[in-house]
A protein has these predicted regions:
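Extreme N-terminal starter segment of soluble prokaryotic enzymes
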Residues: 1-3
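Active-site helix-to-loop segments that bind/position phosphate- or nucleotide-bearing substrates
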Residues: 5-99
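Internal, well-folded beta-alpha domain core
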Residues: 97-272
């Protein structure tokens, strides 16, 4: 069983658990390794020698923080931190990984996969340096043209092989990703060369006053992930009985499409 999660724009610059890499190829064992080396070198090259306007566009900012820029410029030598701690946006604040019991942290290290827009698919405990790249923003240097969606396309086979390597018959996935990352890696497009008897995908929606919420959904995805970890959820069917403060499961809709069974869970946000 896997839980798929989005990264966050906001990242931790300094952390007491960060440590210096012993070698530059910290990404050697990453799942998405096709084209990663040249992409990172191009990324660093632009930050070190590119125009200020180009860097602002890559970062998605009006003003560049020099400390953050310096860390990203020296990405290969910057201190490393587990991905689940590097990201500190709304969803990760709700998850509050550091204050979970050790068993819950172990659960996430085993089941959580984070879709980075630069490094590709990351395990929760994969160590990454500080970096910045606005969602959906690409870059080009020399012969290298980086685009997040194209990068995932190159690594699709690697990702599927990783997802199914520990599965026996069916594959269960809780998809907590934002729409952009769902498009980067489409669960409905299973390569015909891979043997999967059934793919079971659970996908939550959050509504308030009858309307689907978008921004607040980040927070509640983090809450849902936290509760899965605290309860050590082994089977996604158990989501139907999982209690979450502030949320009420309103409906579960099943959509069958060939080998894919998609279960859409609609949670109502209760007024305080």
């Amino acid at each position: 069983m896997w839980i798929l999660f989005s990264p966050s724009e906001k990242k931790c610059l300094e952390h007491k658990k960060a440590y210096q890499a012993k070698e530059e190829t910290f990404y050697r064992d990453f799942i998405c390794n096709i084209g990663l080396d040249e992409a990172l070198k191009a990324y660093i090259g632009i930050l070190q020698g590119g125009k200020e306007s180009e860097i602002k566009q890559m970062f998605g900012v009006k003003n560049i923080d020099l400390e953050e820029l310096a860390a990203a410029q020296n990405l290969m030598q910057s201190p490393l931190l587990p991905a689940v701690l590097r990201y500190i946006g709304v969803a990760f604040s709700a998850l509050d990984f550091e204050h979970l019991e050790s068993y819950a942290r172990d659960y996430l290290n085993e089941h959580l996969l984070i879709f980075s827009n630069l490094f590709g698919l990351l395990r929760a405990e994969d160590k990454i340096p500080y970096y910045d790249l606005k969602q959906g923003e690409g870059f080009e240097r020399g012969l290298v043209e980086f685009n997040t969606r194209k990068f995932y396309a190159k690594n699709t086979k690697n990702i599927w092989e990783y997802l199914i390597k520990q599965q026996k018959e069916s594959l269960e996935i809780l998809d907590l990703r934002a729409g952009f990352y769902q498009k980067c890696f489409d669960l409905s497009k299973i390569p015909i060369t891979l043997k999967i008897n059934e793919l079971l995908v659970y996908e939550p929606n959050f509504i308030k006053n009858g309307k689907v919420v978008s921004h607040y959904a980040k927070h509640y995805r983090g809450i849902l992930l936290r509760m899965c970890a605290k309860e050590e959820l082994k089977c996604l069917q158990d989501l139907s009985s999982l209690y979450m403060e502030g949320l009420e499961l309103e409906s579960m809709q099943t959509i069958q499409d060939k080998k894919i069974k998609r279960i859409v869970l609609t949670y109502a946000i209760k007024s305080k």
